[in-house]
Amino acid sequence: MSKVDLNKETGPREVFCGLTSIVWLHRRMPDAFFLVVGSRTCAHLIQSAAGVMIFAEPRFGTAILEEKDLAGLADAHEELDRVVNDLISRRPEIKTLFLVGSCPSEVIKLDLATVAEKLNSRFLGQVRFVNYSGSGIETTFTQGEDGALKALVPLMESTDDEKLLLVGTLANNVEDRFKKIFNNIGITNVESFPPRQSTELPKIGKNTKVLLAQPYLSDTVRDLKHRGCGIIQAPFPLGVEGSTKWVLAAAAAFKIHELKVHEVIAPLANRARQAIEKHKEILRGKKLFLLPESQLEISLARFLHNECEMELIEVGTPYLNRDLMEEELNLLPDDTKIVEGQHVEKQLDRVRASNPDLVVCGMGLANPLEAEGISTKWSIEMVFSPIHGIDQAADLAGLFSRPLTRNQILTSKSLATH
């Protein structure tokens, strides 16, 4: 195992909450609806993150808790029943309705599990109700997907069929390319979780081999293991290196020789490496500081160091599941500084002291750092962009080279005007 420098830090944090994950989950499952039980702040957050026009009809909404609800002066359960009835009558195409808890609903101890159970009885055969928490009190924003998938695992039927299960939301075109690669190497029974329709949950069992596409699904993985699924240990499919090793790990689990994998992947990998070169010219030798937010930080650091030759100052991550991240840690250079958790003020002090060329951080920190002359990249863009797979490696590198190019152009123009 790589001898990385592991550290833990606690204190004030700066992260989005798990409600943000609704933005990509509702796109993934168009027959589902996500009803947040929360405040007006919750509603503004999701609306802003999704960029949806006010007259559109998105597949998410907020049942707003008013002051009288929070004060216990009204029956929030009755009001929620009314909202759900109105929603189902207006949107009969909904097949699964997620009741999503928030910080306010958790503070007043609103029992959404019981609400979901009663609604399932009332709408039996028409709509399925599932509940999970998107609260940001103890979690970061990508863990909203973990909560949603964990809530679906008990609904997955059992099977003894041998299959590969890709777990974690992927862009549809990325998923299609992965399935084509797996089919070409001889793995033909491949399914995805979450599926493209919420009512088409894959069946699972002792012959299901799980290959994680996202690193932030610890609770979902735990429940899949309890159902008998095997977990394939692999790096995550970011960049040429990560994607190749990811496919090789799946091939090994199905006893397919690695030569077959390289035969299929080699042309893709060669094209991707050539496409990365123009970005590498910009990124090579640049100092990188990753602040914790998405749990993608370790995989991104590995890609940017190994394939783009960036220098890693510090790699922050909100949480570190060593079992899931072991293969990634093995690919990092020795003595890479990894900090689990966050004390945002101390980390910002280290950012300023290290004078990085690029900081990957949350939106709330980006503008203040830019005002200090430090180039930034929003970490939330990594989950809104199709970055997985060999074909996307150059696009992933481009997400990091563009801020540096922009900064060079702005600096040149500023000097020219003086």
Swiss-Prot record:
Q: Print the keywords alphabetically.
A: 4Fe-4S, ATP-binding, Chlorophyll biosynthesis, Iron, Iron-sulfur, Metal-binding, Nucleotide-binding, Oxidoreductase, Photosynthesis
Q: Which Gene3D superfamilies match?
A: Nitrogenase molybdenum iron protein domain
The EC class name is oxidoreductase
**Biological role:** Component of the dark-operative protochlorophyllide reductase (DPOR) that uses Mg-ATP and reduced ferredoxin to reduce ring D of protochlorophyllide (Pchlide) to form chlorophyllide a (Chlide). This reaction is light-independent. The NB-protein (ChlN-ChlB) is the catalytic component of the complex.
Q: Which organism is it from?
A: Prochlorococcus marinus subsp. pastoris (strain CCMP1986 / NIES-2087 / MED4)
Assembly notes: Protochlorophyllide reductase is composed of three subunits; ChlL, ChlN and ChlB. Forms a heterotetramer of two ChlB and two ChlN subunits.
**Cofactor needs:** [4Fe-4S] cluster
What protein name is recorded for this chain? Answer: Light-independent protochlorophyllide reductase subunit N
Catalytic activity, EC: 1.3.7.7
Task: Report which reactions are catalysed by this protein.
Answer: chlorophyllide a + oxidized 2[4Fe-4S]-[ferredoxin] + 2 ADP + 2 phosphate = protochlorophyllide a + reduced 2[4Fe-4S]-[ferredoxin] + 2 ATP + 2 H2O
One Gene Ontology BP term is: light-independent chlorophyll biosynthetic process
Residues involved in [4Fe-4S] cluster binding? C17, C42, C103
Any Pfam family the entry gives: Oxidored_nitro
What GO MF annotations does this protein's record show? 4 iron, 4 sulfur cluster binding; ATP binding; metal ion binding; oxidoreductase activity, acting on iron-sulfur proteins as donors; oxidoreductase activity, acting on the CH-CH group of donors, iron-sulfur protein as acceptor
